[in-house]
Amino acid sequence: MKVIKTLSIINFFIFVTFNIKNESKYSNTFINNAYNMSIRRSMAESNPSTGAGGSGSAGGSGSAGGSGSAGGSGSAGGSGSAGSGDGNGANPGADAERSPSTPATTTTTTTTNDAEASTSTSSENPNHNNAETNPKGKGEVQKPNQANKETQNNSNVQQDSQTKSNVPPTQDADTKSPTAQPEQAENSAPIAEQTESPELQSAPENKGTGQHGHMHGSRNNHPQNTSDSQKECTDGNKENCGAAPSLLSNSSNIASINKFVVLISATLVLSFAIFI
């Protein structure tokens, strides 16, 4: 009797440890799943959807102040500039000699009380345009025009040469293109042969399927049922495809539950046998 009690005690501890391991496995998976779900929810709450609030410049800084000369003080001075040495013509010395004899400009301004309207008249020197009085200046002014005409002629010649050089390659490409068409036709012939070859290869497969069709009545033809189920899965019947894995998962869960119940019942029986 003592030996039986000792063995029962040993078995009791073994079953208890085994049950604890199984429970720890299931509890760990459950806890991990719950923890992962809580982390995902917290991440979703901490990262809200960023709206479209862009920092835009609301203040439009515009020049609203219109500074206008509203003063009524007008300048009536008639200061005229005598002929400067740096003239527009080619002979600045002639400008300097002619300028003292005639004044350049004389301005007269009349101002009203409100200074809103002002009229000015100016008399210019008729001899101010030195390019017209100086024949030498005309010759020097015309030289740049001749240079521009020469450059334009050169550019026109270059454009003509470019257009001539661009024309022949297009004609050559057009003349060569008909020769490439027979080569493409020759290349298309082996492609047609390749397309015919798969039909010949598919013929024995059709024969094999016909033979399998005659063998459905035999008893030893169980693997074909699995192939039929696979065909249904490939056809798109999701119900048939999901049936097998769902049954397997349920059976595994049921087996684990049965083992757990058996171990608990065994430990209870041994505990009663030991202490009673």
Swiss-Prot record:
Low complexity composition-biased segments: 91-127
Record's GO cellular component terms: plasma membrane; side of membrane
Pfam families reported for this sequence: MSA_2 (PF00985)
Bias (Polar residues) ranges: 143-169, 176-187, 194-204
Signal peptide residues on this chain, from the entry's feature table: 1-20
UniProt-annotated stretches for the region Disordered: 44-242
Residues lipid-modified (GPI-anchor amidated asparagine): 250
Keywords annotated in UniProt: Cell membrane, Disulfide bond, Glycoprotein, GPI-anchor, Lipoprotein, Malaria, Membrane, Merozoite, Repeat, Signal
Membrane topology: Lipid-anchor; GPI-anchor
Glycosylation sites: 22, 36, 153, 225, 250
Prodomain positions: 251-276
Top-level taxon: Eukaryota
GO biological-process terms attached to the record: cell adhesion
Composition bias type Gly residues, residue spans: 51-90
Stretches forming Sequence repeats: 53-58, 59-64, 65-70, 71-76, 77-82
Chain spans, region Polymorphic region: 44-202
Region feature 5 X 6 AA tandem repeats of G-G-S-G-S-A, mapped onto this chain: 53-82
Coiled coil spans: none
Major localization listed first in the record, in broad terms: membrane
Comment field on protein domains: The N-terminal region appears to be involved in lipid binding.
Protein name per UniProt: Merozoite surface protein 2
Species this chain originates from: Plasmodium falciparum (isolate 7G8)
Name of the gene encoding the protein in the UniProt record: MSP2
